[in-house]
C-alpha cells in the first residue's frame, strides 16, 4: 500500500476527468495546490497523437516544479481511449515537492481510472518524456535492454507503492528515505545516549531548514515517558529502557516514532515518515547503537510499563518456557505497530 497523503480530486476535477475519458481532450496537466489536485491546463486534440505530442507536452514542463501530465493516444481499449501518464519530477525541484508528488501518484491514477492508462513515463529531464523518450521507453519494455535512470526510478516507485512508505533517499536522494542533516548538538546527544550518559533524546525536524535538530534530553524515567510525547507534532524518541527480564538487569535502547494522526500537516507526516529509516541507519551504523525495538505510536498514553515490556520481550519469543501456555484473549491492547528492520523481518520469517 502506498503512503497516503490525503490529497484528492475535487468534484470539478472529476468532471474534467470524465470529459477527458470521453475523448474531449488530448492533454491534461495536473498539479497539487493547497493540498488538492487541480487541472492547470486542458488541450483538445489538434492532429494525430504523435504530431501533437512534443508541442503539447514539453512547453508545460517547468524546470523546478513537478507535475503530472495525462496525454491521450488515438487508440482505445474496452474502457475507452488509452492514455499515457507522465510523472514529471525535475532534478532541481524541491525534495518536499518530489516526495509529495511521488506519494500522490497512485491517488491520481485511481481518480482518473487506471484502466485507461496504457503506459507510465517518469522523467527528470525533458528528454525522458519527449516523444523520442517515450518511444525509447516502449522499446525497453519489449526488450531486455538495461533501464534508463528515469525508468529505474519509476520501477522503484512502483515497488514502494506495494510496500509502505513513500521515499526519496538522502538530501542526495534515493527512493529509500530522506536523510536530512543531523545538527551537531543532536548528534552529540545521541553519542551520549550510546555511552549511557543520557537516558532520553528527543529529535524533531526543522522543516524550514530541512535539518534534524535536538528537542529534549531531559532525564526521563519510564513513568515520565508519556509526558514527553507532544500531542500536536511528530517526534523521534530514543529511550534507554532500564528493566529486569528473567532475573537479568537490562538497559535497552528503544526508538519511538510518535505521530499524532491527522493533527499534523501532510508535509510533516511525509517528512517524518521518510526521514525515519535514514536516521536509524546513521544511529545504528555510525554510532554502533543497538536499537532493540522500533515502535510507532499515536500518543503517549500507549507507553505503559506493560506495553513497553511486551514490545521489547514479545511473549512468542519468551525464554525458559517449560510448557506451551494457552494464548491470552485477542485484542487486549489492539494491534501494535512495529517498525521492523530487515534483520527482525528475516528472523520472524525463519
UniProtKB/Swiss-Prot annotation:
Residues 2-139, 175-313 form the ADF-H domain. The keyword Cytoplasm applies. GO terms for molecular function: actin monomer binding; ATP binding; phosphatidylinositol-4,5-bisphosphate binding; protein tyrosine kinase activity; protein-containing complex binding. InterPro entries: ADF-H (IPR002108), ADF-H/Gelsolin-like_dom_sf (IPR029006), Twinfilin (IPR028458). Widely expressed with highest levels in brain, liver and kidney. Also expressed in heart, lung and testis. Not detected in spleen or skeletal muscle. The modification Phosphotyrosine is found at residue 309. One of its GO terms (cellular component) is myofibril. Signal peptide: none annotated. The modification N-acetylserine is found at residue 2. It is found in: Cytoplasm; Cytoplasm, Cytoskeleton. Residues 317-350 are annotated as: Disordered. SMART domains: ADF. The modification Phosphoserine is found at residues 143, 277. GO terms for biological process: barbed-end actin filament capping; negative regulation of actin filament polymerization; positive regulation of cardiac muscle hypertrophy. Keywords: Acetylation, Actin-binding, Cytoplasm, Cytoskeleton, Phosphoprotein, Repeat. Phosphorylated on serine and threonine residues. The modification Phosphothreonine is found at residue 349. Interacts with G-actin; ADP-actin form and capping protein (CP). May also be able to interact with TWF2 and phosphoinositides, PI(4,5)P2. When bound to PI(4,5)P2, it is down-regulated. Interacts with ACTG1. Actin-binding protein involved in motile and morphological processes. Inhibits actin polymerization, likely by sequestering G-actin. By capping the barbed ends of filaments, it also regulates motility. Seems to play an important role in clathrin-mediated endocytosis and distribution of endocytic organelles. Belongs to the actin-binding proteins ADF family. Twinfilin subfamily. This is Twinfilin-1.
